[in-house]
Each structure stands twice: as structure tokens, then as C-alpha cells.
């Protein structure tokens, strides 16, 4: 295996080496995630679970409608009007139990929505006796992801596993960069000509052309350079080539929805796989579930379901032979239901040009037996290598990876898996292999003064500003040191403290200043609540800021740095938290995290930080 002695290999001499390495890494990740959940449930008392926001107690539930045949249950707190602090977010897999999920069989559901006063959860099967008990809510672990990544690794290991670009992806060839640049072989057709959208700038157009002419293309998109815009135009160009159904994936549901929205706007026939609850509401009409509900064969399906339900209701009063025949008919009925469902899905997939889903979602069994010669992965630098391979093992002959290895890497829970290489994305390994990414070099988000520092320190001054200062005027409500340079540092003398749950950090003095700055900007009337974002490296500070905000500020987003990648706001308030004599800036020493934090703002960036930390010199650009 090739690569540095201290890090994971960049290339592999045998597919077996790759298989063994990554199979161990994903096993460690699953084991450590489940052990982490188990230890907290076993060892933490009720008070600590509540303070850490990972468990809610004393919930009462009631049915609250349906989402494409799945039951929605609304949970509220029996003892108080609001839900209190918690870390549950839309799309999270959760466990519902009466007392203890480790001592009973919990119900598994998915968070549909959260508010100050309630949490709505979607269940595949309607829970029984939901109104008769009080419930507790815990976060669950995602074993499906492990199973699908394991299957993908097995396919890569197997020469007949349906991965035409296997040797290139693993570096098992003499000259990977040259091989990556070769014309793809797409079903016997060596590259059909296509047209490109007129709204691409020069770097975007170069990337789009490469994506249709090369076997493997890496596209690096720094903040605000139009990664998703370019990805959508590539997918549109591919769809006009009419070579076969295209697979478009990303690591997160948010990024998949952005691709979906762009494709729908361009008139591309697209279907979105995945649970509708995880899809943006206005896009749910493009989900497989919604399309199945509107399919002409839906009536046949409902008729068969009604017949089965009638038999189920009557069977308890039957005896002997009659009962045996009824069971036989029910079994035949379910077989017919599955046949109709498969027929509907196949018809939808046969007529679609692009299938959109998450990397892990592309392992869904409804795609089994299908091949996708062209695969695009957005957010490729936030996906672990095994997650990316789930999509690439669907028969990819032409691949585009879009991302930015100067921003946040994949999220990995297991320290040992991270140390051995799981935190390195496939995109980054291919860069290390010598395949140079095409740079989208014009940024359209930030005021030039805001983009100056990240351009110098992360992108070697290779970025151009596509917006002028006069188009990003500093907002009122703050006495900017220089109105032509909307980057401000607010020095705070106040110490950091360990959060009440003992797992994070917070800084009360910074919290007070953040709230004051927030109110001052809003009172000026030029910026709305949804135009401001508050970023901090620590979950404890997120909680402290939220707890200090009045109800009228609910619409202001407060997130960790990790929760803000891919997002932008008119104004960003950045609370740094750390305050110590050792000049220890903690999470901020990770330059990729700092890059994300400093590149979310369009018109104004305000850093609130301890006076003597090194961060002020960084921000005074």
C-alpha cells in the first residue's frame, strides 16, 4: 500500500487491502457510536441526560395526521408548556420508550419537525396505545448506513462487483491522473456531444466541459463559488446526452434537496429517494412516495389493500378450513401488493432522467439491478470514502466529485477510526493521488473585505471577487471601525466555563455581548431575523445563547460551525468562546473549521472573542 508512514494509504496494491482497512474503520465507527449511546443511557442520570439535550422525559403523544402513508405523532411535555433544551433535529432517527430503551423494545421513528412546544415524529407503523402512556425520547444509532457501506466495500473487493472504475479509484494503475482524463466508455458510446448553460462563468464552464469529457473529474468549490449551480448544470448536460439514468447524490439531505430544486427549475425529470420527512416540504412532490401516490396504478394498489384489510378484520371470527383459506388469500394479497408497488416504482424510475438521494440512500434496495453509468457526488469532501462508494458501486463509468477539501471533513464519531483515516474523504485521497481538482475561482457571496483573509490563507490568493463592495454594504446597527471593511472584532474580558453537562464549553460574557449586538442590528431595521446567523465552535455556547434569547428571536439561527457549512447569511456573529492564559483556541486551531466560520457572511462579519487570543490578529485583515 502506498502513502505516508504516519497516515492512511493513498493508493492500494490490492483491493483486499482497501477492503480490510475500510471494513475495520466502519466497524469501529458503528461500535463506538452504539457504545457511546449505550454508556450514556446506562451511566448518566436523568438530570444529566436532560442537561445534555439527548433525552426528553414525560412526553405525551397524540396522532397528528399522515405523511404519505406514515403516521405523524405529536409529542408535548406533560409537565410544562415548552420542550426545553434538546439536540433533536428534523430527520434524526429516534427511539421512543415508556421507561428505558435498553430494557424494552423501543419504537423507532424519524423527527418530522421541532418547535419550542412540541416534537412531531413519523413512524412507519402506527404506534399502539400512544395516548395511554407517558414516553421518553432518545437518539438512535444508524445501522443501515453501516450495512450499505459494507456492501459497497464488498463490491469494490469483488472484480465482478459492478465498479468499472475500481482500479482507478483505488490507485491500482500506473498513472491515475492520465487515466482519469480519458474519454469515458458509456455503454459503447464514446462521449456524445452536449450543450452547456449560458449562465456559467469561465471556471464553471471549464469544469462542466471536463465533467462530460473525462472519466473522473474533481471540482473544488470554495465558499460562494457556485458548486451546486455548476453541479446542476453538469447533470442537465448529462441528461441531454441520454445515455441512461443519472445518479446524483450528496452526503446530507440539505445538499440533495439543493440539487433537486435546481434540477426541477431546469425542467429535468427527477425523482427523490428517501423518507419524505427528510425532504424540504416544497420539494416533496418529487419524492418517490408522492409520485407513487399519484400513479395511475395507485387505485389498483388501494383496492388490494382494502381487500386484505377486510379479510384481516374477519379472520378472528373464522374457523377451520375457512380460516386457512383466508390466510392463504391474505398471503396472495400481500404478494400482489408488492408486485403492484414494484411495478409502480419501476415505471417511475424508467421515466426519470436523474435519481437524487443521499450517498447512503443510493444503497436502497429499490435500485438493485439498475446501473447508473454517470454519477455525481456533491459535498464529496464531507462524505467518508465508504459512503461515497455506495453510489459509485452502482455501475459508474463517469464520475464527478464536487467539494472543497479546505472546508470541513466528514464527521466521524470514533477516535480510532478517525486516526486511521476514516475522516479523509475519497475526494481528498484522489487529490493526494495526483488528480488535480478544477477550481471554481470566482466567489459571489462575500464582501471583498470578508473574502480577503480566507482567500490568502486557504486558497493561495487564487480567488476572484464576483461582487463589488457597493453591492455588499455594511448593515446599520453597529459602529463599524471601517464602513468600507465590514469585519469587526469585539474584545471581551470574561472567562470560559465548562458547560453544566460537563461535555462542552461556554462563555457567559460573550453570550451577553452576542445578544446585545443582535438586538442592536435588529433594532436598526435594515436586517431581519432570518438574515442573521450566530456561529460558535461549541455546543455548550449554542445552548447558552439560545437560552438567553427572548422568544421574539426564535427565528435567528444559532449553530455550531459544523452545522453551518453550505449556509450563508447577510450578517454572521461569531462567538469564539475560548478565554485562557495559555492562548488555547481549541476547535479554532482546526483551520478548515475556521475557514467555514469566516466565510458564511455576505455583508458583515462580527467576531466576539477574548481580548488576548490570537484570533483578533487573524480577523484584522
Functional labels for PLM-detected ranges:
Residues 241-244, 252, 360-613, 620:
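Conserved helicase motor core of SF1/SF2 NTP-dependent helicases
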Residues 106, 123-125, 179-292, 332-341, ...:
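ASCE P-loop NTPase helicase motor core
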Residues 74, 87-89, 93-97, 110-112, ...:
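Beta-strand cores of modular interaction/reader domains in eukaryotic scaffold and signaling proteins
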Residues 2-25, 31, 69, 80-206, ...:
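Pre-ATPase regulatory/linker segments immediately N-terminal to the P-loop/RecA-like helicase/translocase core
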Residues 272, 277-339, 461-478:
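Non-catalytic helical/coil scaffold and regulatory linker elements
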Residues 61-74:
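Short, basic/aromatic beta-hairpin or loop at an interaction surface
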Residues 82, 194, 343, 558-560:
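Short, solvent-exposed loop/turn positions at domain surfaces
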Residues 23-52:
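Extended boundary segments
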Amino acid at each position: 500500500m502506498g502513502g505516508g508512514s504516519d497516515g492512511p494509504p493513498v493508493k492500494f496494491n490490492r483491493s483486499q487491502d482497501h477492503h480490510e482497512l475500510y471494513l475495520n474503520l466502519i466497524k469501529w465507527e458503528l461500535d463506538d457510536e452504539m457504545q457511546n449511546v449505550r454508556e450514556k443511557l446506562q451511566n448518566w442520570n436523568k438530570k444529566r441526560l436532560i442537561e445534555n439535550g439527548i433525552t426528553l422525559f414525560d412526553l405525551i403523544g397524540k396522532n397528528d395526521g399522515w405523511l404519505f402513508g406514515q403516521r405523524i405523532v405529536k409529542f408535548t411535555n406533560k409537565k410544562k408548556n415548552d420542550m426545553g433544551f434538546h439536540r433533536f433535529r428534523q430527520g434524526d432517527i429516534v427511539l421512543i420508550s415508556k421507561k428505558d430503551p435498553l430494557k424494552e423494545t423501543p419504537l423507532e421513528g424519524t423527527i418530522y419537525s421541532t418547535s419550542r412546544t412540541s416534537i412531531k415524529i413519523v413512524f412507519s407503523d402506527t404506534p399502539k396505545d400512544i395516548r395511554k402512556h407517558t414516553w421518553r425520547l432518545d437518539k438512535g444509532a444508524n445501522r443501515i448506513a453501516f450495512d450499505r457501506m459494507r456492501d459497497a466495500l464488498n463490491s469494490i473487493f469483488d472484480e465482478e462487483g459492478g465498479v468499472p472504475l475500481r482500479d482507478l479509484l483505488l490507485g491500482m494503475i500506473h498513472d491515475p491522473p492520465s487515466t482519469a482524463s480519458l474519454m469515458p466508455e458509456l455503454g459503447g458510446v464514446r462521449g456524445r456531444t452536449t450543450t452547456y448553460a449560458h449562465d456559467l462563468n469561465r471556471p464553471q464552464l471549464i469544469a462542466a466541459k471536463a465533467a462530460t469529457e473525462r472519466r473522473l473529474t474533481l471540482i473544488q468549490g470554495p465558499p460562494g463559488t457556485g458548486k451546486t449551480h455548476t453541479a446542476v448544470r453538469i447533470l442537465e448536460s448529462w441528461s441531454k446526452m441520454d445515455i441512461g439514468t443519472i445518479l446524483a447524490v450528496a452526503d446530507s439531505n440539505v445538499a440533495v434537496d439543493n440539487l433537486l430544486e435546481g434540477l426541477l427549475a431546469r425542467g429535468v425529470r427527477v425523482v427523490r429517494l428517501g423518507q419524505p420527512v427528510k425532504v424540504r416540504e416544497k420539494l416533496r412532490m418529487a419524492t418517490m412516495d408522492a409520485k407513487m401516490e399519484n400513479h395511475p396504478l395507485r387505485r389498483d394498489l388501494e383496492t388490494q389493500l382494502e381487500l386484505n384489510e377486510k379479510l384481516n378484520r374477519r379472520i378472528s371470527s373464522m374457523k377451520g378450513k375457512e380460516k386457512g383459506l383466508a390466510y392463504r388469500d391474505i398471503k396472495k394479497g400481500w404478494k400482489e401488493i408488492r408486485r403492484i408497488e414494484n411495478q409502480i416504482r419501476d415505471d417511475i424510475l424508467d421515466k426519470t432522467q436523474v435519481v437524487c438521494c443521499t450517498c447512503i440512500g443510493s444503497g436502497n434496495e429499490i435500485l438493485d439491478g439498475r446501473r447508473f453509468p454517470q454519477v455525481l457526488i456533491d459535498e464529496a469532501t464531507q462524505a467518508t470514502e465508504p459512503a461515497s462508494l455506495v453510489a459509485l458501486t452502482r455501475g459508474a463509468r463517469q464520475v464527478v466529485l464536487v467539494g472543497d477539501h479546505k472546508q470541513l471533513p466528514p464527521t466521524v464519531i470514533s477516535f480510532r477510526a478517525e486516526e486511521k483515516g476514516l475522516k479523509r474523504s475519497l475526494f481528498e485521497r484522489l487529490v493526494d493521488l495526483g488528480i488535480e481538482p478544477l477550481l471554481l475561482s470566482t466567489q459571489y457571496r462575500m464582501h471583498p473585505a470578508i473574502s480577503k483573509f480566507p482567500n490568502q490563507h486557504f486558497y493561495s490568493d487564487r480567488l476572484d471577487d464576483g461582487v463589488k463592495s457597493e453591492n455588499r454594504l455594511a448593515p446599520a446597527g453597529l459602529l463599524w471601525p471601517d464602513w468600507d471593511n465590514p469585519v469587526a472584532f469585539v474584545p471581551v474580558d470574561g472567562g470560559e466555563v465548562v458547560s453544566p453537562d460537563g461535555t462542552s464549553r461556554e462563555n457567559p460574557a460573550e453570550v451577553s455581548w452576542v445578544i446585545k449586538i443582535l438586538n442592536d442590528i435588529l433594532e436598526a431595521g435594515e436586517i431581519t431575523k432570518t438574515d442573521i446567523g450566530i456561529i460558535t465552535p461549541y455546543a455548550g455556547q449554542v445552548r447558552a445563547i439560545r437560552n438567553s434569547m427572548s422568544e421574539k428571536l426564535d427565528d435567528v439561527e444559532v449553530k455550531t460551525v459544523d452545522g453551518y457549512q453550505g449556509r450563508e447569511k447577510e450578517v454572521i456573529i461569531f462567538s469564539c468562546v475560548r478565554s485562557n492564559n495559555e492562548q488555547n483556541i481549541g476547535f479554532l486551531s482546526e483551520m478548515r473549521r475556521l475557514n467555514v466560520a469566516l466565510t458564511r457572511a455576505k455583508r458583515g462579519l462580527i467576531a466576539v472573542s477574548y481580548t488576548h487570543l490570537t484570533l483578533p490578529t487573524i480577523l484584522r485583515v
